Amino acid sequence: MSRDDLLSWIPAGHPDEMLVRQVNFERLPEHIAIIMDGNGRWAAQRHLPRVEGHRAGIDAVRDTVETAARLDIKVLTLFAFSIENWKRPATEISTLMMLLKRYLRSELKTLLTNNIKFRVIGRMDELADDIQDELRAAMDRTANDGGMLFNIALNYGGRAEIVDAARRAIESGIRAEDLDERRFATFLYTAGQPDPDLLIRTSGEMRVSNYLLWQIAYAEIYVTETLWPDFRRRHLLEAVLAYQKRERRYGGISIGQARAK
């Protein structure tokens, strides 16, 4: 999508217009991964139950998915529910699952309209049958969409993914001497996808929370104090602009450092 296409979606004179004009569409991250954090604090600041923070977070998901698709991001991965989240109160978990079902039903048309392919990464088979049915229906309906790939990490843990990948590698019969990093990556949930170029975490916390541990080896990390329910198009654009100001080295040295040698 071109800059003009994205600008046509933004009302004339809106502050986001200036941000879009600064974006270099030749240096966009292929894959953006986001840790959606801060729902509970958002609710607490407003003296509301935690579940209201999760409800408000749905609007942030909707805005972020559409913005990323219009930016022509190839892959967007959102961390929705971790393996560790099962430790939370049963009422909160049931609300999260209800909101997930509601989102899929209400937003499926938007996903199809924007040519977005929906996928789940994580131990989906451990979720309730009705949740699995909703997820599979959304994946089936969008399977042929050729636009942005939208991953939701559900019942997900980075260490669990690596363990699951190791098991699949063993089950495949691959010989130990034939297993290298490239081959091992084909057994991950994200096989065939580019690794995240940009990892965004909301709420100001400085940790990766067991998220995409293998894949974020060389990702640029951007942390914003913004709580997830308040995260909007502007915040995603700001993260992309910050990413574009960085020099990715992949363990090497910068051009300036090389010349100094």
Regions flagged by a language model, labelled:
Residues 1-261:
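Flexible, compositionally biased loop and terminal segments
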